């Protein structure tokens, strides 16, 4: 559904959304017959180029500052990880500050602290980037299995809170098959 590049107005956005509903969710189209935007600012359209920035910036004064969360790790919003990333980054940084005590908070500490956060965030990046591509056959199989298995559906939903849980079964066809089989065996 990468079809938003020419959408410039609220009405065009609403119309494109309704076209998508009619094409992919026709059983819901009738329910959307009288739909309208709440206001002319009630839409969002854009894209983000995923990137990871250097964590430490030197200001004109010579002081160094440590960036955090989505100021450093920019993801497409498709997986809704912006708030998660900010909270997870703040937790990592706070613990690193507390552990560091009264020592100097220099570039080395800042880079090490970011690396601790990156240990989590790299999984968010990998998963989010995978969602920008057409799903491979094993992910389609996984989603189909989730529609028939509450434990599999729960595993997927719960991994939104900690995308590290998606590895390796989201990314590897063999691991995915084993994941599905294990959950089916436990359900039996």
Residue ranges and their predicted role:
Residues 55, 62, 79-98:
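A short alpha/beta connector and helix-capping loop motif
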Residues 45-77:
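FAD-binding beta-loop-beta segment adjacent to the flavin cofactor pocket
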Residues 22, 31-33, 47, 53-54, ...:
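Arginine residue identity/basic-tract feature
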Residues 79-80, 94-188:
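C-terminal helical "tail/cap" subdomain of flavin- and related membrane-associated enzymes
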Residues 26-47, 115-133:
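A broadly tuned preference for mixed-charge, low-complexity surface segments
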Residues 1-45:
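Conserved FAD/dinucleotide-binding core of flavoprotein oxidoreductases
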